[in-house]
Amino acid sequence: MTVLAIDPGSEQSAWVLYDGQRVLGHGIIPNDMMLAHARVNYYLPVVIEEIASYGMAVGREVFQTVRWAAKFEQAVLEQRRITGVGAVYYLPRRDVKLHLCQSARAKDANVRQALLDRFGGEKAAKGNKAAPGPLHGLGKDEWQ
């Protein structure tokens, strides 16, 4: 099953298109482009990272990010009303950390390493330009 995963941000968002075995596409793009991307890919399950503060104070940037996540969700659901297909799921980062690292305290580097390990280590997972691995080209927020 192919899934569109979105890590929303206040101005730009990371996205990964994953088919269960390899990354089919990825990028970090301005939010207005991500909104269009969500509308076009509405027929896929869309998984959006759920924002959580865990009791910490949050600022304007976090609220902007939450608004954009809701806009992405709305874009998919509007298309679903028209076509009858499409689904949106929110996934808290904490759940990802627990699943991949068995610890809610895992850091970004731990999550990245767990993903590399799952695909045979860094060399096999990333590959190279001539022989790309299933995670070839991922960077920054695309790992999360």
Annotated model-derived regions:
Residues 1-144:
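Phosphate- and other anionic-substrate recognition elements at nucleic-acid/protein interfaces
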